[in-house]
């Protein structure tokens, strides 16, 4: 049973990817000449960003979670993000699992994605589909950090 303090601290869960997937993401960042690319060690997909702690069990195993994605630029605060939106039933399912056990979510919908840059400036990118084999290495969880953006500076 969680204590009140534990429940109040929130939960963050993310997917980390295989070395081959990270190689492919870095190659895509280079081919697209992405400014301010997310470094290899920080590439991930958020599964759960909950303001309450829930008893989430991380999945184990390494398997393909998506075979392609398309680019979108999202406005997030003062810097436009470049994301690779993934068509991933697995990531959607894991997010739904977190919600089913009581996790909160700050947005209307959950969109599985990998952030390629936290600041692409005024650049625009075509919304075409990019074939990319996205293989899960592991999931991890930690207490929620509301000031996570400070780590990007």
Curated annotation (Swiss-Prot):
Assigned keywords, A-Z: Host-virus interaction, Hydrolase, Inhibition of host innate immune response by virus, Viral immunoevasion
Protein residues bound to 3',3'-cGAMP: 12, 142, 148
Pfam families: Acb1 (PF23474)
Entry keyword annotation includes Hydrolase: yes
Catalytic activity, reaction form: 3',3'-cUAMP + H2O = U[3'-5']pAp[3'] + H(+); 3',3',3'-c-tri-AMP + H2O = A[3'-5']pA[3'-5']pAp[3'] + H(+); 3',3',3'-cAAG + H2O = G[3'-5']pA[3'-5']pAp[3'] + H(+); 3',3',3'-cAAG + H2O = A[3'-5']pG[3'-5']pAp[3'] + H(+)
UniProt GO BP: symbiont-mediated suppression of host innate immune response
Transmembrane region(s): none
Residues that bind 3',3'-cUAMP: 12, 142, 148
One Gene Ontology molecular-function label: hydrolase activity
Record: active site: 44, 46, 113, 115
Function statement: Counteracts the host CBASS antiviral defense system. Phosphodiesterase that enables metal-independent hydrolysis of the host cyclic di- and trinucleotide CBASS signals such as 3'3'-cGAMP, 3'3'cUA, and 3'3'3'-cAAA. Does not cleave cGG or cA4. Besides evasion of the CBASS system, might also enable evasion of the type III CRISPR systems that use cA3 signals.
Family indicated by similarity: Belongs to the anti-CBASS protein Acb1 family.
Protein name in the entry: Anti-CBASS protein Acb1
Gene giving rise to this polypeptide: g142
């Amino acid at each position: 049973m969680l204590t009140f303090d534990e429940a109040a601290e929130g939960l963050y869960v993310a997917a980390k990817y295989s070395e081959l997937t990270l190689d492919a993401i870095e190659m895509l960042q280079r081919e697209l000449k992405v400014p301010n690319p997310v470094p290899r060690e920080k590439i991930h997909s958020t599964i759960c960003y909950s303001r309450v702690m829930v008893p989430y069990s991380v999945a184990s195993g390494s398997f393909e979670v998506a075979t392609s994605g398309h680019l979108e630029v999202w406005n997030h605060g003062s810097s436009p993000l470049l994301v690779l939106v993934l068509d991933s039933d697995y990531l959607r399912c894991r997010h739904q699992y977190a919600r089913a056990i009581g996790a909160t979510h700050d947005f209307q919908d959950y969109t599985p994605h990998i952030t390629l840059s936290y600041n692409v400036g005024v650049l625009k990118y075509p919304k075409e589909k990019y074939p990319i084999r996205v293989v899960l290495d592991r999931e991890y969880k930690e207490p929620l950090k509301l000031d996570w953006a400070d780590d990007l500076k």
